[in-house]
A protein has these predicted regions:
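Short, structured patches in soluble enzyme cores that scaffold and shape functional sites
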Residues: 49, 57-59, 83, 91, ...
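Short, small-residue-biased leader/transition segments that mark boundaries at the very start
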Residues: 3-8
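Double-stranded beta-helix
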Residues: 63, 92-193
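Conserved short histidine dyad/triad with adjacent acidic residue
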Residues: 12-41
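Short, structured beta-strand/loop micro-motifs enriched in basic residues and often containing a Trp
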Residues: 58-68
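Conserved metal-binding segment of the jelly-roll/cupin
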Residues: 72-93
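Short, conserved beta-strand element in jelly-roll/cupin
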Residues: 15, 39-60
């Protein structure tokens, strides 16, 4: 069995300011591969440190994308992506860089096949005026896009105003669900970002 120090991949990620034509700087949509440790696709925990972000997520990469969310996050906000969900990280302000922490299982990898078959995520952003406009990808069946702020994840041991690093320092077992999502199976069943 692996210890907590072995299972987390802690990343500091920085996106340059700017855009790619009308599109914001963003990651390619992906799903985390099933971990050989847990036999689950693993969640990801984001904490925004600089800039403005949207963590886009959808339940599935099949023709029926399920629920689709654009979670708008500011510095200090935490956003959790559940196991098996498609997700992408988007910088929403072309005038500043986006810097964030991202935690996932160290054995993670990405699944792209179904997303590529659909030519991307179910909704993709473009800059329009001072904000983002979301365009539906017609390679998926229609699913409404819910735009929202991050919630407090009390069911996962995360509240507002305390960094995930401080939470980990004080109580590392809080994040056992990152390498072993089954310990929070009941949360993932009806997950709301």
């Amino acid at each position: 069995s692996r210890g907590l120090g072995d299972v987390y991949k802690r990343q500091v990620v920085a996106y340059a300011k700017g855009s790619l034509g009308m599109e914001p700087i963003r990651s390619q949509g992906h799903i985390h591969k099933v971990s050989p440790f847990s036999q689950w696709s693993t969640p990801e925990v984001y904490e925004i440190w600089n800039g403005e972000a949207v963590i886009y997520m959808q339940e599935s990469a099949t023709d029926e994308p399920g629920r689709c969310y654009a979670v708008y996050a500011q510095p200090g906000d935490v956003v959790v992506v559940p196991p098996y969900w498609v997700h992408a990280t988007i910088s929403t302000n072309a005038d500043e860089s986006l810097v964030f922490g991202a935690w996932c299982d160290r054995e993670y990898g990405f699944e792209y096949a179904e997303i590529r078959r659909h030519k991307g995520i179910a909704w993709y952003p473009v800059f329009e005026g001072d904000g983002l406009k979301w365009i539906r990808n017609t390679n998926y069946h229609f699913s409404e896009l819910v735009r929202k702020a991050p919630r407090e994840y009390h069911d996962l041991g995360i509240g507002k105003g305390k960094s995930i690093y401080k939470i980990f320092e004080d109580a590392p077992d809080t994040f056992l669900y990152v390498p072993n999502p089954s310990v929070k199976k009941e949360v993932w069943i009806s997950f709301e970002p």
